[in-house]
């Protein structure tokens, strides 16, 4: 586990050059925030105390899709129970809900989404700082694995966003989008992004001084995406709309090589590894706390 003492993690950045390894220091003097994105926070709940030296922010996805769509995701009501426990432990300002991705099928209609969103919003009222919505992009891999999915058209996106904003106001949950149609701002959504300077300052209570040279990963994205220490082809949820996993066989092979004692997510050190230090620095303004 991670404690107040510095730890190191290693990541093979390029599958075509697997000998290239990046070393990250997991230490409070260079890591301002640990950001988690998950559909199931429960396995981490008993170990949160090990992260007490770090600021945290959690995005937890809760959608209405059943096991045919998300076969490895726990029952949604269990997930919501974990979100409430997480919020109670670290504070609602450090927890956000993702309703993502939004798509249409014969089962999951516009009306279905409206009813489901309200049920979840009712459960999470007072437990989260905001909700991020996003609409499914039909990548070729997604079309192949999930042929019945339909993208949400522009007018339906605007209708759903307006309704989600209305429901969100009712339950005290602002709606945000990230890299979606900028016109959704007219529907009442905050389109500035999900992991922005403002969001992280509110969560941590500290001013962040971001270098001007810091660039977004995608055009139109203002999120502070730092060092991603996760990997593709390691998630066992098996969601049919996923574009990050190649196939079940690759995931199973990777999981087989996971060693909890290793500083790599998958595998360990190999002969010939070329280890490069990640460029890391704190952006916290030590002189200024916001509140």
Report residues per predicted region:
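Single conserved hydrophobic/aromatic residue that forms the stacking wall/gate
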Residues: 1-6, 10
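Local cysteine-cluster metal-coordination motifs and their immediate loop/turn environment
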Residues: 227-246
């Amino acid at each position: 586990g991670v404690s107040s003492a510095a730890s190191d993690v290693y990541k093979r950045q390029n599958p075509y050059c697997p000998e290239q390894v990046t070393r990250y220091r997991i230490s409070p003097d260079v890591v301002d925030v640990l950001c988690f994105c998950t559909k199931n926070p429960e396995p981490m709940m008993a170990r949160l105390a090990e992260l007490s030296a770090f600021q945290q922010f959690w995005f937890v996805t809760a959608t209405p899709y059943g096991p045919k769509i998300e076969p490895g995701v726990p029952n949604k009501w269990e997930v919501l129970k974990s979100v409430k426990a997480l919020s109670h432990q670290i504070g609602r300002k450090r927890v956000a809900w993702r309703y993502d991705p939004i798509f249409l099928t014969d089962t999951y209609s516009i009306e279905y989404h409206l009813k489901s969103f309200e049920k979840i919003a009712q459960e999470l009222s007072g437990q989260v700082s905001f909700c991020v919505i996003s609409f499914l992009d039909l990548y070729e891999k997604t079309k192949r694995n999930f042929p019945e999915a339909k993208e949400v058209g522009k007018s339906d996106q605007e209708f759903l966003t307006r309704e989600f904003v209305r429901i969100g106001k009712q339950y005290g949950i602002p709606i945000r989008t990230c890299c979606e149609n900028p016109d959704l701002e007219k529907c009442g959504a905050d389109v500035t992004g999900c992991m922005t300077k403002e969001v992280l300052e509110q969560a941590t209570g500290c001013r962040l001084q971001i270098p001007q040279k810091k660039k977004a990963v995608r055009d139109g994205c203002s999120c502070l995406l730092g060092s991603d220490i996760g990997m593709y082809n390691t998630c066992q949820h098996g969601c049919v709309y996923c574009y990050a996993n190649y196939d079940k066989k690759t995931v199973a092979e990777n999981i087989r090589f996971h060693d909890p004692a290793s500083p790599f997510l998958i595998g360990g050190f190999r002969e010939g590894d070329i280890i490069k230090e990640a460029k890391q620095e704190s952006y916290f303004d030590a002189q200024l706390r916001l509140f």
